Design a protein with these regions (language model features):
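Charge-dense, intrinsically disordered terminal/linker segments
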Residues: 1-25, 32, 48-50, 58, ...
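Active-site neighborhood of HAD-like aspartate-dependent phosphohydrolases
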Residues: 19-70, 159, 169
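Short His-Asn-centered micro-motif
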Residues: 27-29, 81-84, 102-105, 147-149
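A structural signal for well-ordered alpha-helical scaffolds and beta->alpha junctions
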Residues: 33, 37, 84-87, 111-116, ...
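Short, acidic loop-to-helix structural element flanking the phosphoryl-transfer center
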Residues: 71-101, 108-113
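Substrate-recognition "cap/lid" segment bordering the active-site pocket of phosphatases
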Residues: 102-145, 151-155
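Acidic, Mg2+-coordinating phosphoryl-transfer loop and its flanking beta/alpha structural elements
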Residues: 145-179
Length: 182
């Protein structure tokens, strides 16, 4: 026969609420969950590192011209990007902590719609904040973790008092998160 305390314990174990954590997780999209580099290379025929050589204006100019040549809207480009090869694994681990996506839109406002569509298709009901890269740091605090693939965003986040985790692979990110009990 069940005691009331046994039933309470069982119900508590079955709870679907997020595990208690003292940390708020913010996760970037491009280069962490979403494979922007692969999408860019498939679209333009050029690797994304050419931005470092040619400059951002030519990088985005090539992007826009390729979209026009292939008759693809910027909204559709962003909405149809693929997961990073290990992006789902990372998401499956952090989703229980109710993370917020913190992503920088491109120069074209249509990227905002495309990113929202991607989230709705792949991870519905996930909060999404679209902020310029230099504004991400405004969400930092001592209990806020940012997972991002850009060192400049991590440095800004850390300088603003947050905990930045430079994402190079899911394995290394999960290892770093484990140090915070996540």
């Amino acid at each position: 026969m069940y005691k009331l305390t046994d039933l309470y314990k069982q119900l508590k174990e079955e709870s679907t609420e997020a595990p208690q954590s003292q940390y708020k997780i913010y996760c970037d999209m491009d280069g962490v969950l979403v494979d922007f580099d692969k999408g860019y290379q498939e679209l333009t025929g050029k690797p994304t590192h050419h931005a470092d050589v040619q400059g951002k204006n030519e990088f985005w100019g090539t992007f826009k011209q390729s979209l026009q040549d292939k008759k693809i809207s910027e909204k559709d480009y962003w909405a149809n990007l693929q997961w990073m090869p290990d992006g789902k694994e990372l998401w499956d681990h952090i989703k229980q902590y109710k993370p917020t996506l913190l992503s920088a839109p491109s120069r074209d406002p249509q990227s905002r719609w495309g990113k929202r569509i991607w989230v709705k298709k792949h991870i519905p009901n996930t909060p999404l904040i679209l902020a310029a890269a230099e504004a991400k740091k405004n969400y930092a605090n001592k209990n806020a973790i940012l997972i991002d693939d850009r060192i400049s965003n991590i440095n800004d986040w850390n300088a603003a008092g947050g905990i930045g985790i430079l994402h190079t692979s899911t394995a290394t990110t999960l290892d770093k998160l484990s140090k915070y009990g996540i």
